[in-house]
Amino acid sequence: MAAKDIRFGEDARTRMVRGVNVLANAVKATLGPKGRNVVLEKSFGAPTITKDGVSVAKEIELADKFENMGAQMVKEVASKTNDNAGDGTTTATVLAQALIREGAKAVAAGMNPMDLKRGIDQAVKAAVVELKNISKPTTDDKAIAQVGTISANSDESIGNIIAEAMQKVGKEGVITVEEGSGLENELDVVEGMQFDRGYLSPYFINNQQSQSADLDDPFILLHDKKISNVRDLLPVLEGVAKAGKPLLIVAEEVEGEALATLVVNTIRGIVKVVAVKAPGFGDRRKAMLEDMAVLTGGTVISEEVGLALEKATIKDLGRAKKVQVSKENTTIIDGAGDTAAIESRVGQIKTQIEDTSSDYDREKLQERVAKLAGGVAVIKVGASTEIEMKEKKARVEDALHATRAAVEEGVVPGGGVALVRALVAVGELKGANEDQTHGIQIALRAMEAPLREIVANAGEEPSVILNKVKEGSGNYGYNAANGEFGDMVQFGILDPTKVTRSALQNAASIAGLMITTEAMVADAPKKDEPVMPAGGGMGGMGGMDF
């Protein structure tokens, strides 16, 4: 086992704080509307330019192992906040730095680290309650657009396109971000349920222009096994032909005689049919077929529940207003399912989302919720260069996470004002002893740090602006973009409550651990072995030329 280098007490904390400051100073330069960019070197290709706090934090590794431990712990604050709320990484880093710096000073002055931590925790708990009291729910598209705009570094076009996407696919809808091919941002919306399976035969195409099979007001047959014998399908086909409606068949596979008969019927115009494979595999396929059944008001024809295909009738089929089938995708629009049944199914899937530990499963379950609840929107990010594209895409993703957080827990006035307003509730607290009370004071000073940093990045004097904001009440704050004081909500400067809350809680969590650290252990640096001297020539080799 390699030898270890161990540091204790003040020496350990000083090095750790030095590492925290290096990382936090690089990250906090990006905070606020007048925050600066940070350029990140890449091992290949052009450097990346970003104003995203977590992207900067992830790139930082320090040479000194003890300083690096401090930096890595603050990096954890940024990452955790990003995972929880999708934004607020820079705010979390600024809060953590302020708490750690003041906490380390107090420990150096002889205060009890555990009492300091208890005081900080007490203050954070009170601040979180106050943030929830200040919070207002987001009910309109305008508020959603404003949250997106602020998170995307005051880019209104991003805020507006996210609000439009949410309006079209609903709050539960899936919104994905892709790299576009043009200069402008574009929004593509797929309404209804879409899955990645196309028609099984090109003979089903009835719209030559779009090379797709379009069915109006069709019946939908859902089956979890292969269909190869046409006799099994006859009762359903006869019922559909009598009703004079088209039919969509979704099954594990349609092949052989069955597929040939369906194609012939379609070409002759006897029954308009399109057959597609069911999406997914195994249990996920069964679940998706069940989703389709709920959406269309039909039943999955499955022998597992005692339903044989040859016994199926027209009553077992689902309905939809329209179905579009292309070579790769099938879209079911406006299914005839019962709204209460759909909501119940969505609730069931949401419970599974909470219970699952796999990110992949969670993503797939969220997609299923979106397909049932409204649809899928794709934001295609436009830019003139690849470097700009990457930077812009990261901002759009941040803004999207922030708007989701805003919908979830509401919004508070932005620009660091919400934390300043929460100071009143925290200021009333008293600790069980002097050291705990000092811990509360540390949290009070730290909660001012985000506003101070926003003002400093805008080139103004932080203390002057902070005092003026403190003199006001409610939403009164400072707009660093144009130097005006006023109502932050009217200015459109809003932060999601979840983002501010997560930033404060995660910063306090790591700061508490670092303040109470008494020893640090790292691998001792390896000493370079002396180089072997060059060997002498062998005897009897004199006079040879090399």
Swiss-Prot record:
Protein name from the UniProt record: Chaperonin GroEL
Oligomer and partners: Forms a cylinder of 14 subunits composed of two heptameric rings stacked back-to-back. Interacts with the co-chaperonin GroES.
GO cellular component entries: cytoplasm
Species per Swiss-Prot/TrEMBL record: Xanthomonas campestris pv. phaseoli
Gene field: groEL
UniProt keyword Nucleotide-binding present: yes
NCBIfam families xref list: GroEL (TIGR02348), PRK00013.1 (NF000592), PRK12849.1 (NF009487), PRK12850.1 (NF009488), PRK12851.1 (NF009489)
Function: Together with its co-chaperonin GroES, plays an essential role in assisting protein folding. The GroEL-GroES system forms a nano-cage that allows encapsulation of the non-native substrate proteins and provides a physical environment optimized to promote and accelerate protein folding.
MF (Gene Ontology): ATP binding; ATP-dependent protein folding chaperone; isomerase activity; unfolded protein binding
GO biological process: protein refolding
Principal subcellular localisation of the protein: cytoplasm
Family: Belongs to the chaperonin (HSP60) family.
